[in-house]
Amino acid sequence: MFNGNPSVSKKTKRKVEKAMEELNYIPNALARSLVNKTSNTIGVVVSDITNPFFTEVIESIEEYLNSQGFTVFLSNSRYTVEKENQYISQMIEKRVDGLIVFNTCTEEESIIGKIKNIIPVVTVQSALKETDCVNTSDETGAYRAVDYLIKQGHKNIAFLVYNFENSNISNRMKGYFKAHKDNGIEINKKYILSSDFTPYCGYHMTNMVLDKMPEVTAIFTYNDQLAVSAYYAIQMRGLRIPDDISIVGYDNIGLASLMRPTLTTVEQPTYEIGRSAAELIISRVRDQRKSTHHTVLLPTKFIVRDSVKNIK
C-alpha cells in the first residue's frame, strides 16, 4: 500500500493515511530493507574530510546517489590503513549495499581484496586489482607541474608528500621523476620530504626545506592542503612568494584562487570523479553478476597563476 499498490481502493488508502497522521507514523526504512534485502545505502570512505577536494567529490557522489534513491554513509580514514579497514568492516556490518573507497593503502594492507566478491566496491585513485575504479591522470598532472617549474629556471625542487603508499602518490612521484629526467636534471632525493598525516605536517616539512636546503627555489606539494601550510610557513618568516620561493600545488581547491598570491596548481575534475564513482557503484549494485571491471581515467588540467617566479 505504501508503495502505491493499485489494488488498494482510494477509500481504504485515505483511512490508512489518516491513521498514519494521527499516530505520527513514519515508514520504517529498516523493515522495508529486510523485505527487499537492500538498505539503499552506499558506504563512502574518504581520506581527509577536512580537505575541500574530498568535500567537492562527496557532494557529487551524494547528488547522484540521492537521485537514484540511495543515501550516503560517510567515514573518514585520516589516511590510515587501520581506520580504512575498520570502517569498511563496520559498513558491511551495517548492511550497506556497496562501497566507494578512496584507497590509502597497498593491495597487501587493504581488506578490499577479501570482501570485493561479497559486496560491490568502487575504488577511487587506487591501484587495487579487479575492482571498478576511478582514477585521474596523476603522472601527467605532476609532470606538467614540475616541467613548468623547470622551464621557469628552477632546478632544485622540493616535493612534499604524505608518508603512505597509494597509486596517486606513486603516480605523482613518477611525474616528478620523469620531468627531471626529460630535462636532464639529476634528482636529489633529499628534496623529497614525507610525513605522517597531521594538521601541521606541511608547515613542518616546509620549515625543514627552508632551514636545511637554502638552494631550493621551488616547492611542489602533493595537494593544495600542503600548499596552504607551505604558504603559512614561508610568510611567517617574512619571506615572499614567489620572489623568495615558488609554490605549485595539486587539486585546485576553491581556496587556491583566493590565496595571495594565487596558487599555481593542477586541477582535478572533482565533479566528474564523484559522478563516475557513483554511477559505477549503482551499476554494480544493480547487476552484481557483471564479470568485467571498469576503470575510468579522467584528465587533469594545469592552472598557471601567480605563485611561480621565472628565475632564468
Segments (PLM) and residue ranges:
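Short acidic capping loops at alpha-helix termini that bridge into adjacent secondary structure
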Residues: 155-156, 187-191, 241-246
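Flexible loop/turn connectors
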Residues: 207-208, 212-312
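Hinge/beta->alpha junction and helix N-cap segments in small-molecule ligand-binding domains
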Residues: 46-56, 74-83, 109, 134-144, ...
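Periplasmic-binding protein-like
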Residues: 88, 96-103, 158-160, 213-223, ...
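Conserved hydrophobic residues forming the short capping helix/wall of the S-adenosyl-L-methionine
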Residues: 20, 65, 179-180, 210, ...
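N-terminal helix-turn-helix DNA-binding module of bacterial transcription factors
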Residues: 1-39, 312
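Alpha-helical recognition/docking segments in bacterial nutrient-uptake
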Residues: 33-147, 151, 211
